[in-house]
Amino acid sequence: MSVGSIISGRKPVIGVSGESLVRAIVALLHQHRIGAVLVMDGSAIRGIVSERDIAAGLHTHGAAILDTPAADVMTS
């Protein structure tokens, strides 16, 4: 089974740059009703930022996490 066959018919995969702020990622998650975004470097996947990563950041750093770049909170 290929990845393409698994995600076929699902919501589009959203990617952001490593410089994207968590604040913008939260907006994308809400807007697209998704739980994670890929962190991209051109066409290469560098990591993923999930709701869980953001929740952990909020617990550890409070609201300051919202102004943190994706590269600093992503799982890779």
Model regions and ranges:
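The conserved cystathionine-beta-synthase
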Residues: 15-33, 40, 58, 71
